[in-house]
Amino acid sequence: GYLDYDEVDDNRAKLPLDAR
């Protein structure tokens, strides 16, 4: 998921938690 930068597996890898 994209809840955290290190566990991200989507194209949102560089977006902050608020930008999900």
UniProtKB/Swiss-Prot annotation:
GO terms for cellular component: extracellular region. One of its GO terms (biological process) is blood coagulation. It is found in: Secreted. Conversion of fibrinogen to fibrin is triggered by thrombin, which cleaves fibrinopeptides A and B from alpha and beta chains, and thus exposes the N-terminal polymerization sites responsible for the formation of the soft clot. It comes from the Eukaryota. The modification Sulfotyrosine is found at Y5. Keywords: Adaptive immunity, Blood coagulation, Coiled coil, Disulfide bond, Hemostasis, Immunity, Innate immunity, Secreted, Sulfation. Heterohexamer; disulfide linked. Contains 2 sets of 3 non-identical chains (alpha, beta and gamma). The 2 heterotrimers are in head to head conformation with the N-termini in a small central domain. Cleaved by the protease thrombin to yield monomers which, together with fibrinogen alpha (FGA) and fibrinogen gamma (FGG), polymerize to form an insoluble fibrin matrix. Fibrin has a major function in hemostasis as one of the primary components of blood clots. In addition, functions during the early stages of wound repair to stabilize the lesion and guide cell migration during re-epithelialization. Was originally thought to be essential for platelet aggregation, based on in vitro studies using anticoagulated blood. A long coiled coil structure formed by 3 polypeptide chains connects the central nodule to the C-terminal domains (distal nodules). The long C-terminal ends of the alpha chains fold back, contributing a fourth strand to the coiled coil structure. This is Fibrinogen beta chain. It comes from Ovis aries.
